[in-house]
């Protein structure tokens, strides 16, 4: 099994967290969209990373990759057992992809003028902060156990300070701050970090 992974891309990072949490034997080849072999990028009709190759199977959508890994390597499970809980988890992951990731991508790429970037940063902070109440009820992201939803959220939280976005030290946000420190301290998360990603918080 080989994962072609960008060195500091949050989409690649979420897959690396799954690999690390499950202790899956996988060769991680760090590259970029510009330097990845054409035969690898050709697996993905959108010609970008990450790309996961397992024998004759090539996967390019991170949601598909992560659920494939969870089914192929069922221990520890990263999706809830019951259908309703699984559906809720998938809805959360979809929300992150549709509402939070586009804002994060715009800020990372510096899309738009200074005013637009400032607005995107403010909207991103608002979206992230709105999640804080959930961590009063659950130890993890809407779950009692670490799951794929945490794998989606953790890479985003890790990148915020490097983008000039700091969660306020307020009573309302404290559950989220406590949560992120708990996640960042997990051996699986630490093992998932590339050298560039590790430097984001040094």
Feature locations, PLM:
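Short, solvent-exposed turn/loop segments enriched in Gly/Ser/Thr/Pro and often Arg
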Residues: 6, 148, 196
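Phosphate-coordinating loops and pocket residues in cytosolic domains that bind phosphorylated ligands
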Residues: 42, 185, 194
């Amino acid at each position: 099994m080989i994962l072609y992974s960008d060195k500091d891309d949050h989409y690649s990072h979420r897959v690396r967290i799954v690999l690390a949490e499950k202790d899956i034997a996988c060769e991680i080849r760090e590259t970029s969209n510009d330097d990845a072999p054409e035969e690898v990028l050709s697996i993905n009709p959108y010609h970008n990373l990450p790309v996961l190759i397992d024998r004759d199977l090539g996967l390019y959508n991170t949601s598909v990759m992560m659920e494939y890994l969870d089914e192929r390597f069922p221990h520890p499970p990263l999706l809830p057992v019951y259908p309703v809980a699984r559906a809720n988890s998938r809805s959360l992951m979809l929300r992150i992809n549709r509402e939070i990731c586009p804002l994060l991508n715009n800020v990372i790429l510096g899309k738009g003028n200074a005013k637009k970037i400032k607005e995107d940063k403010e909207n991103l902070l608002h979206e992230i902060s709105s999640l804080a109440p959930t961590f009063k009820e659950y130890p993890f992201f809407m779950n009692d156990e670490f799951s794929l939803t945490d794998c989606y959220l953790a890479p985003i939280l890790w990148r915020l300070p490097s983008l000039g976005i700091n969660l306020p030290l307020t009573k309302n946000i404290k559950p989220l701050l406590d949560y992120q420190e708990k996640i960042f301290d997990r051996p699986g998360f630490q093992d998932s970090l590339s050298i560039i990603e590790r430097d984001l918080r040094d």
